Amino acid sequence: MQAQVFRVPMSNPADVSGVAKLIDEGVIRAEEVVCVLGKTEGNGCVNDFTRGYTTLAFKVYFSEKLGVSRQEVGERIAFIMSGGTEGVMAPHCTIFTVQKTDNKQKTAAEGKRLAVQQIFTREFLPEEIGRMPQVTETADAVRRAMREAGIADASDVHFVQVKCPLLTAGRMHDAVERGHTVATEDTYESMGYSRGASALGIALALGEVEKANLSDEVITADYSLYSSVASTSAGIELMNNEIIVMGNSRAWGGDLVIGHAEMKDAIDGAAVRQALRDVGCCENDLPTVDELGRVVNVFAKAEASPDGEVRNRRHTMLDDSDINSTRHARAVVNAVIASIVGDPMVYVSGGSEHQGPAGGGPVAVIARTA
């Protein structure tokens, strides 16, 4: 198996021209696409419909290209859209493809290479979102994805991206009508509960937390429990979790590798450099032009520190009634990463409940080997 990854700019939420160009020119085959991971220019909140709009645009395109229904497209390709391109972040999508190749002649000296596997959970009932059923279903799915990708060791997993559902007024009403409660009656807060439950599922699958320490009560409450490689993004456009596991495996060929580090806070540039160093792209204090030329994309989570401080300095992101704190945080983290890699077209998703330490989050880099 061999993974390929392509980063493509988007001029608007329905712009599939960059991907179409790659396919028309024979750079990639539509049949080999397994995931489209996008940053869309909406507000990243409950009523951000750019995520669904972009997903629909890609489903229509691939449906026509592959000659199958949109439903079938959705069953074979994970469309994970994260809304919010605040600050200098450039809207774009990252395309993951998997080619079936024979790596039997590969030597041990060639090392591990990027392995990717997409997988889907079942659809969740509204009363399950942000609670233990979502945790355990996500954990089971991540374990299956690791097996299918040939990733034997949890330490070889460097980034797990999840698109998860949220609660709307209608979904809450449905649960109540059937005699159930929901994790929260605030639609925006439900995004955090869903992200948090999904992240804890990843942590459980990778052995970062013990199941005995998990319950409905700890979700969005006990931030000492987290995954250092989880990246979860909630949206209105689905009711299941769509997951892509990224790691390194000797069973895969190609010239791509992935590494990660843990940002302690929103301005932790040292962690960004460490993630670059993890894939051989920052030998010295700062990456060189040649090293940056091998970087395919950077992926990170962003969050306004819940204690209201960054390095003992007060911040006001949580007190802004006009702009949600996740929007502030995305702009900050994107700027930090862009200042190091020299490119604002990187993937930064807001809301990092149980995704890295409180106020921080994981940062991962996919790059070509030297």
Curated annotation (Swiss-Prot):
InterPro entries: AtzD/Barbiturase, AtzD/Barbiturase_RUA, AtzD/Barbiturase_RUB, AtzD/Barbiturase_RUC. Disulfide bonds: none annotated. Pathway: Xenobiotic degradation; atrazine degradation; biuret from cyanurate: step 1/1. Gene3D superfamilies: Cyanuric acid hydrolase/Barbituras, RU C (3.30.1330.160), Cyanuric acid hydrolase/Barbiturase, RU A (3.30.1330.170), Cyanuric acid hydrolase/Barbiturase, RU B (3.30.1330.180). GO terms for molecular function: cyanuric acid amidohydrolase activity; metal ion binding. Residues 256-370 are annotated as: RU C. Residues 1-103 are annotated as: RU A. It catalyses: cyanurate + H2O = 1-carboxybiuret + H(+). The active site is at K163, S233. Its EC number is 3.5.2.15. One of its GO terms (biological process) is atrazine catabolic process. Residues 113-250 are annotated as: RU B. It comes from the Bacteria. Inhibited by barbituric acid. The record marks T326 as: Important for substrate specificity. Mg(2+) binds at E303, S352, Q355, G356, P357, G360. The monomer structure is formed from three repeating units (RUs) that share the same structure as one another. The monomer, the active site and substrate all possess threefold rotational symmetry, to the extent that the active site possesses three potential Ser-Lys catalytic dyads. It is possible that any or all of the three active-site serines may act as nucleophile (albeit only one can do so per catalytic cycle). Homotetramer. This is Cyanuric acid amidohydrolase. It comes from Enterobacter cloacae.
